A protein has these predicted regions:
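Residues in the helix-turn-helix
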Residues: 11, 22, 51
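Short basic helix-loop element that most often maps to the first helix and adjoining turn
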Residues: 1-15
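DNA major-groove recognition helix of helix-turn-helix/homeodomain DNA-binding modules
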Residues: 36-51
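Conserved Class I SAM-dependent methyltransferase catalytic core
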Residues: 208-273, 277-282
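Short amphipathic recognition helices of helix-turn-helix/homeodomain-type DNA-binding modules
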Residues: 51-66
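Recognition helix of helix-turn-helix/homeodomain-like DNA-binding domains
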Residues: 17-33, 55-57
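S-adenosyl-L-methionine-dependent DNA methyltransferase catalytic core
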Residues: 62-138, 250-253, 276-416, 420, ...
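Core alpha/beta nucleotide-donor-binding catalytic domains of modification enzymes
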Residues: 75, 79-223, 233-237, 242-244
Length: 462
């Protein structure tokens, strides 16, 4: 800085055309600088990206990140990604797939139409993904009227069971589906609820009164080969990890071996940084085959990819005051990029607590995946503004980001449609998980067929 006659951060910020607050955010480890601001810093100091990343006064953690960024510089620049936001795990899919815990699903095909019952089906994101993977839905349980109408509209042949899952579990799920069909998969995402811990280890009857209990009772009744449960990533740490441990204990009591992993939708062709914890259970009598989660894809879909030629649709609008504020934010930016006095006024108390990370006044960049969509597109703490137009994403744009096909229609008011889409599992993520389950079931089928043939030949010889 001294070589450029810049003697303070104030002067550097002035030369860059930003506030000192914005510069502090760029230099801080707490925030993620957007590419345009890093480029401004390079321009003012008249040095390249590599030189900035190799400054001597970086700590060990920053140096480690330097090496990651330097080796992936072309990738980052092509995607217009934020540097700090992309961890080594995200930047090197080949490295994270070297272990044998994951399978390549690119050539997986179902040997037959595997059967599935889905609970908490919502608007069908997971069910549609599983259908694309090769599953046939035998029954879908959902409480919300509009979500049920959406399912019936798009798949008139699906057995949509609208009702209270507590009562359905009490009555027995087999009273609502074809009882002559063996179920291969039970899927669904029950809410994350805390349990009351009377003892050190809880069993099935100890979690009575929760929606998880209803899921577990139906699992116990159907005894499918596999179950799939998805939830928010916070389940892993919820109540100090006790909640997830209790669920695993209950699943084990019912007769299942359990694996779980946090999967990032962006790693499976979804233009969104949504993360979900995926719990897979395989029946203990089928433990001779090991289930593996799907490998990450070798590409990252961007918002530009997702919204190419998107059809027009309805959408929410910002109030005039909010619109004036967001007009000042560049693509990929957020409240950090606002003039200091505007940010202070707009954010209120949140300004002094760091502004809810980067969610407030956030405008998405075309050339990176979108942040996780919520049920309310204009909510202040989790704003997701269109890159070019100062407005929330429309309902069809929402659906595209969640990887729903354009022909999948939604029923209800605009707010109901946003809610259905925001709550959904991204279709492509559902398909990827589905294909990994198909691979497992294919191997089970192969073993059964081999054993049957061996027995038949032996009997024939005798």
């Amino acid at each position: 800085m001294k070589e450029k006659n810049i003697r303070s951060q104030n002067q550097l910020a002035l030369n860059m055309g930003i506030t000192k607050n914005q510069l502090s955010a760029i230099l801080s480890e707490k925030f993620t600088p957007i590419k345009s601001n890093v480029e401004k810093l390079c321009e003012v100091l008249d040095i390249g990206f590599d030189e900035i990343m190799c400054l001597e006064d970086v700590n060990e953690k920053q140096l480690k990140f330097t090496n990651i960024c330097s080796s992936n510089k072309d990738y980052i620049e092509h995607r217009d990604c934020t540097y700090k936001e992309l961890s080594e795990y995200e930047l090197n899919p080949r490295e994270r797939n070297k272990n044998n815990k994951h399978i390549d699903i690119s050539n997986v095909l179902a040997k037959r139409a595997y059967t599935c019952v889905e609970l908490f089906a919502g608007a069908g994101g997971l069910a549609l993904g599983l259908e694309k993977a090769g599953f046939k839905e035998v029954g879908l349980v959902e409480w919300d009227k509009y979500a049920c109408d959406t399912l019936k509209l798009n798949r008139p042949d699906w057995n949509v069971i609208q009702g209270d899952i507590v009562k359905i579990a009490e009555n027995g799920i087999k009273n609502y589906i074809d009882n002559n069909i063996e179920i291969d998969l039970l899927s669904g995402g029950y809410p994350c609820q805390a349990f009351s811990y009377a003892g050190k280890k809880l069993g099935l009857e100890d979690v009575r009164g929760t929606l998880f209990y209803s899921y577990a009772k139906i699992l116990e009744e159907l005894k499918p080969k596999v179950f799939l449960a998805e939830n928010v990533r916070g389940l892993v740490s919820h109540d100090g990890g006790k909640t997830l441990k209790t669920m695993i204990d209950v699943f084990s009591e019912i007769g299942y071996n359990v694996k779980y992993e946090i999967l990032k939708a962006v790693n499976y062709g979804v233009a969104q940084k949504r993360e979900r914890v995926i719990i897979i259970g395989t029946r203990k009598d089928l433990s001779h085959v090991d289930f593996k989660f799907p490998k990450s894809f070798e590409y990252v879909a961007t918002l530009r990819d997702a919204l190419k030629n998107v059809p027009k649709s309805e959408g929410a609008r910002y109030p005039e005051r909010k619109k004036k504020v967001l007009d000042m934010v560049p693509p990929g930016g957020c409240w950090i990029d606002l003039p200091d006095e505007v940010a202070r006024d707009y954010m209120g108390k949140s300004y002094y607590s760091g502004g809810g990370k980067r969610g407030m006044a956030r405008r998405i960049s075309w050339d990176e995946p979108c942040l996780t969509l919520t049920c309310s597109p204009a909510q202040k703490q989790t704003e997701r503004c269109h890159p070019d137009e100062t407005r929330p994403f429309t309902t069809r744009e929402y659906a595209r980001i969640q990887s729903f096909p354009d022909e999948w229609e939604f029923t209800g008011s605009v707010s109901q449609v946003y809610k259905q889409i925001g709550n959904a599992v991204p279709v492509k993520l559902g398909k990827a998980i589905g294909l990994s389950i198909v691979d497992y079931l294919n191997k089970i089928e192969k073993i059964y067929v081999t054993e049957e043939v061996a027995i038949t030949e032996e009997e024939y010889v005798i």
